[in-house]
């Protein structure tokens, strides 16, 4: 039994959910998102509540039931509130700068690393050591944040690198000297 799949999604004011075949579309004040759902899962919209049911109880369908409900709930949250990931740069001389539609990271390489803006995402640099990625799609925000973090992942000896806000880096002990 999928406990998450059986939960009902309550729609906030100004958000509409519609379904055409297997494509679910969510419209809200921040934009519109669409996603294809599995054919084994059916969706019903009654007033301000969205419910999901599955046609069989095999393991794959149970997994799809909860996943589909979670994906649509994230779409509803995205078009109503949006998602934000904050990254921190830790290290001597590490800095980020935004010029026009380009994010430039100086993180200890012999060259700066550039990222172009994505059409549906917003990248902000409130200060030289902080980068904020925001948008309506949780998946796209997380993907861009992961790409930025992968430029210089935190290393375990000094803790230098790009990390998510609140991320704890497990530190290792260095070599023992004689």
Curated annotation (Swiss-Prot):
It comes from Leuconostoc citreum (strain KM20). HAMAP family: Ribosomal_uL6_B. This protein binds to the 23S rRNA, and is important in its secondary structure. It is located near the subunit interface in the base of the L7/L12 stalk, and near the tRNA binding site of the peptidyltransferase center. GO terms for molecular function: rRNA binding; structural constituent of ribosome. NCBIfam families: L6_bact (TIGR03654). This is Large ribosomal subunit protein uL6. Belongs to the universal ribosomal protein uL6 family. One of its GO terms (cellular component) is cytosolic large ribosomal subunit. GO terms for biological process: cytoplasmic translation.
